[in-house]
Structure formats: C-alpha cells, structure tokens
C-alpha cells in the first residue's frame, strides 16, 4: 500500500516536471561580452522563425530573424539578423546585386522596409549564441533597425515577411513564434 502511494506521488511529480519543461515561456535575453574587444552584444532569448509554403519542389524555405544590440563603448546599434535556409538543398543563397536583400516585414497591415548592411558587423558572438540554424547551411544578412521597430514586431498580431528581390512570389509566415521573447528583449534594452 505504501509503495503504491509513493509510486503515485512520484508519477504526479514526474508529470508536473514534464509539463513545466514543455511550457512555452520565452527565454531571457543574454548579454555577451567579447573579452578581446569589450563589445557587448545583447541577444534575444528566442528567434522568430518563418516558413514559405512548398512550391512543388523538394525544398522548403525558412527564415530565422534574430534581434541583437551591439554596445561598442556606449555606441548602441540595434540589428535584425536574417538567416535564409532551405531543407534538403542546404543554404538558400541570396541574390547578388546592389538592389538585392531588401526585407519587407508586414506588421498588422503596416510595412517595414529594411535594407541590408553591406557586410556583417564585426565582433558578433558565435553561431550557437545567434541561433544560426545548425541542421543546414544558411545565408546571413544584417539590417539596422531601432527599438521601436522591434517593439512593433513583438506586439503584432499578424506578421508576414517577404524578400521581394529574392523570392518575389512568396511570403513567409510564422512557424515558431519568437515575438514574446522579442518583447522581453525590447523591455530588457529599454530598462526600468
């Protein structure tokens, strides 16, 4: 009888632990310091991942958006990192040319138009810290933005992303919703 009670209690505790582990609370933002340069990079706790419906080929296209902020001796720069990747075919290369790389983010009927930086910023943390997809090669771009734009994205009800110069006929819709983590990130950077 005592054994049944102990096993029943253990089962209840195990079920509660599993339920707690499966909760969808966003993870906290992280501040990463480069010991060589002194640059601090704040990174969102979870990325926003989007997918484009398959268009009849064997590949499936994805985008990962990661918000970061660089603090280079008091000079703050908010950035949106974009990884484009494809299942089955490896990295999804970006188009070449001066006009490629435009990122359109439709937020509740408003359009945010971001242009890529000419090159990735120096002093970024390692790939794991920046949520670089590890299952396949990915193409990466960086876009300058601001906290208000990040706040707008984090509080949106509808979010659609397009790369008009890359995939003119396709929109990317939410696959894994990192907007709650983005909201935490903006609050973290805005301070008390």
What are these regions (language model features)?
Residues 1-11:
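Bacterial N-terminal signal peptides that target proteins for export
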Residues 18-21:
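C-terminal motif of bacterial Sec signal peptides marking the signal peptidase cleavage site
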Residues 23-25:
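Bacterial signal peptide processing site
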Residues 29-55:
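Post-signal peptide N-terminal segment of mature Sec-exported envelope proteins
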Residues 84-94:
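Short amphipathic, basic-aromatic surface patches that mediate peripheral association
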Residues 93-101:
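Short coil-to-beta strand junction motifs in C2/discoidin
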Residues 106-110, 164:
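Short strand-turn-strand beta-turns centered on an Asx-Gly dipeptide
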Residues 118-192:
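Internal interaction segment
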């Amino acid at each position: 009888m005592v054994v049944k009670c102990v096993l029943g209690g253990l089962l209840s505790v195990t079920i509660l632990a599993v339920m707690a582990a499966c909760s969808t609370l966003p993870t906290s933002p992280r501040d990463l310091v480069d010991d060589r340069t002194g640059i601090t990079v704040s990174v969102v706790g979870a990325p926003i991942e989007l997918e484009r419906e398959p268009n009849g080929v064997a590949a499936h296209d994805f985008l990962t958006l990661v918000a970061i902020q660089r603090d280079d001796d008091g000079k703050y720069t908010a950035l949106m990192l974009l990884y484009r990747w494809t299942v089955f075919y490896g990295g999804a290369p970006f188009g070449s040319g001066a006009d490629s790389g435009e990122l359109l983010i439709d937020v509740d009927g408003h359009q945010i138009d971001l242009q890529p930086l000419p090159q990735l910023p120096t002093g970024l943390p390692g790939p794991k810290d920046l949520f670089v997809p590890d299952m396949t090669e990915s193409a990466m771009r960086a876009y300058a933005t601001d906290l208000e734009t990040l706040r707008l994205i984090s509080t949106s009800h509808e979010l659609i992303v397009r790369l008009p110069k890359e995939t003119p006929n396709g929109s990317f819709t939410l696959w894994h919703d990192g907007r709650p983590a983005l909201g935490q990130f903006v609050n973290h950077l805005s301070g008390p």
